Amino acid sequence: MLLHIIARGKIGRSSEAEMVERYLKRIGWPTKVTELPDRGGTIPIAPPASVTIALDERGEAVSSMLFAKKLEGWRDGGKREAQFLIGAADGHDEAQRAEADWLLSFGPATWPHMLARAMLAEQLFRATSILANHPYHREG
């Protein structure tokens, strides 16, 4: 299953960009990053057999284990792509939230969207590591 991060804003050559790159290189699944301008630009149309996840502070906060179970369920259920949407500084509008299959939160705090991208990359690596029985994740 393709893990596709669709993010508003250019990450450039920042420490966050280095973190994103480091984690995405370690993931054994195919990955893709699409950057859109802060305003405007078109979110790529979700292909058939895909799931859309919007990162949103009002979404569901889950453990790394539950996040891995979600990925596993989508993969084993025939989803070919998981699109992770990261909004700009003002987040997503109501229509984007309504269209998403799942709203995911990294807790009640508000995170800078560039840091949220790095956090998502790490959680994707952690989740795929859990599913591969890799020792990276330590529960408890």
Task: Give the residues covered by each predicted segment.
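Short glycine-/polar-rich loops that comprise or flank the Walker A/P-loop
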Residues: 1, 29, 50, 99-101
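Structured adenosyl-cofactor binding patch, chiefly the S-adenosyl-L-methionine
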Residues: 96-140
